[in-house]
From Swiss-Prot:
Organism encoding this protein: Mus musculus (Mouse)
Signal peptide: 1-33
Tissue-by-tissue expression: In cartilage, expressed mainly in mature chondrocytes including prehypertrophic and hypertrophic cells (at protein level). Expressed exclusively in cartilage.
Bridged cysteine pairs (disulfide): 101-111, 125-145
PANTHER family referenced in this protein's UniProt entry, alphabetically: CYSTATIN, CYSTATIN 10
Keywords, comma-separated and alphabetical: Biomineralization, Cytoplasm, Disulfide bond, Signal
Biological classification of the source: Eukaryota, Metazoa, Chordata, Craniata, Vertebrata
GO molecular function annotations of the record: cysteine-type endopeptidase inhibitor activity
Protein name (database record): Cystatin-D
Amino acid sequence: MASLLSPSMPVLAAVALTLTLAVIPEASTNAEAKQVVLGGVEPADPKDKEVQKVVKFAVRTYNDMDNDLYLSKPIRLMSASQQVVAGKNYYLKIELGRTTCTKTESNLVDCPFNEQPDQQKRVICNFQINVAPWLNKMSMTNFNCYNF
């Protein structure tokens, strides 16, 4: 009975491969096709609303964890990338500056940067933020900052 099934195995393998190539265009050998790396890190658009939400979350969390009496706010978003996982990981590099607002003040938008030479503080931080939209949850999974 095994000999009856043996000739059909190569046929089944060929059919499976053909269906896979037909259903997944990225698996084709077309040189112009975009290379897709599942789970790979890709650039994120800094102007995207989701990226802006993640930046605000990262800065708010940084301010909550930082021992400084004053709030910091973004000077510039240096880079942003994303990775599809169980949800999405965002990797952000943000330059932050100390403001004149203390942590008891809540409106960071209106806080000017502290320009007094002895009070200026600038840091560059790398943040990793995980977003699980089905749980309505963001969490900072890693970060490090350095003065410059």
